Amino acid sequence: MKQVKTGKSLLCLVCSMTLLSLPMTVCAWEPNAKDRDAAINAGNFTAYSGQLTAWLKQKVPADPAQITQGKMRALLSDAVFVDALAERQFIGKVWDQPDLGGYAKADPKNKAFVAWVMSNGKLMDEVMLTRTPSDMSSRYDNSWSINAGVLENWKQIYYAYPESREGLYLRLAVACALRPPGTGNVGAGMAKEQSTPLARFGNYLKAHKNKELVPSFDTLTAWEMTHVVSSGASDKDLAWGREALNTWNPDYVWKDENVVGLASQMKYQGSQIPYYTMSCLLAGGGKCGPRSSFGVFINQAFGIPAIGVAQPAHAAVAFRDKNGNWQIALGRSWNVSKLSDRGNMSGGEFLERVKERKTKAFGNVEHLRWLAGNLTGKAQIAAVMATTPAIADASKDAIVAFQPGRGAAAAASTKPLTKPEPPIKVAPGVIHVNAGDFAHIGGISGVGPGVGVGDCYTGGKQLHFGAMSQTAWVGYKINVPKTGIYELTARVSVINWGQRLYARSFGAMYRVKSATASDVYRQDSSLGPQMAIDHDLGTRWAMNLGKEQGWIELDLGQPRSISKMIIDEHSWDRVSRFRVEYKAGNDWKMLFEGGDIGWECKKEFPPVTAQNVRLSLLDGKGPSGGPTIWDISVGDVFDGSGWINADWDPATAGCWQTTKPLEMRLVAGAQTIWLCAPSQRGLTLRWFELKPKGTSTQVYAVAPRKTL
């Protein structure tokens, strides 16, 4: 029995030794949730990080000669490997006091948040790639890190906004945490005290839900969003920028997302006011620096990534267009540009890095860099980095799992309205006229139409009298129930001070039978003297260039008592001296003389009876000559006329306002009332009303206008 027992013992010993000599693959450590959760609960990642490092290292051939591009490509196509690599990078890059373990241990909410982040390898990967600087110098150095404050900012968003945990809003949350307000370009008009990542997230979340951001915002990566949310402008200014531009001229937004064009509305001059807010920046004007600052701001307000650009003795703007391509605005080309994405780059390098980020190449290169950071042998590290792919070898559209649905931007015309207006209320007897209900429209402009007709952001139509217009006009047919004095108020939007419209009615002064003139521009009948007496402020009498002296004679058809006269030169302002006479028998007798005529020369004189009245132009201002008269009216009572002046306030610039009343004389019956704009910075008209002076303010509702 003793020998048999000894034999069995020897057999067991041999079997045990054999088993011990077999490979231990079934027992080898693999990345797993249990060990990760244990590290989070303990608030100590030392052991877990070491296990991750060892696991990653054993995936790489020990012999540098065996490290090939094919083998590295195979590793990078292994989702488990990439998740583990991103996790190891995430643990290693969080620093400061507390570190990742200390942060998780400090509060139960911290622990739950860290567990949520670390349970998603693709999320950690995107966070790390988003935080990675774009310039090659910083990437080679690889000393960048993430402090615990980033996690705290992100955690606040995570708990305050449950929708921030997936899709578009997750990308937005990551961007806000990584690039807090004020960490982008800092320039004129920026906030004195910066907002918080939580408030900035709420600002853009609300704007997106209200359909205030451009359609292409939905297609942005987290990295692209960092160049939106990092704006140094206040949240109040960002909201103002959207409302002001959507009100004043929404075509900038919804036609090709060209919001940077608004910066061109800044007058190129030293500002006349301090840059307290972005509205002050826009109104006060500025040279290249302030214009660049505003250009970056207004892009970011609408969700368009933008960066300030330095050029020789100049500043410009780089922005991402709706097709995903970066462009330069307000400056010269890329080859003279310098800009920064955490590190300084030339314009050419920036474009290369953007191109790289659009492909898997950026992620693959950084993954190999992270992997090399876990190795110790110099030859092994060099062999790994030698396999980095070229951009041309990379596949397009590197979309991670939490970026679903990135596609072409929706057509701007399908954009829903943000703020449908309440029903308009009109008092009995009040004449209410919508801007789009015009009978005549026109203008003389250096660029584009004198008056732009566009869709109002709140429904219906609006008119925009543009900055490049020398003069513009619009006529509205109205029916006046009773002759008398009416108060004209208008709903307008302006972004600069000093903006106004000239209003004019006809009918109180005499209808002129005919007119003759000393000269007509190129004998063009459409510019003949009759055009100055037709009660149409879109027509004019013009003389030939090179002439400063001439005359126009009016025939009233019969002798009439006259004591008042209006002469309108619009914006031409070419006359410096003139004389007005009336015919008494065969003689001309003077009524009055003057210098400038301008928009409205309104004269009252002792009554005389006359059938013929003559305006003589005696001298001009410019070398080219060629006076132009848009209207001449005479009578014994004035027509309604005057200026509608818009107020400017930094807090409400660009938003709708109702002007102070302008008293206008109207004559009962059908007529046309005219609104004209001089050369100025731009004004938008929504509607106007004419109320009999002294009438009741009782109102009734009008059906809402149709939405777009």
Model-derived features with residue positions:
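Hydrophobic/aromatic-rich core segments of domains that either
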Residues: 272-279, 284, 289-374
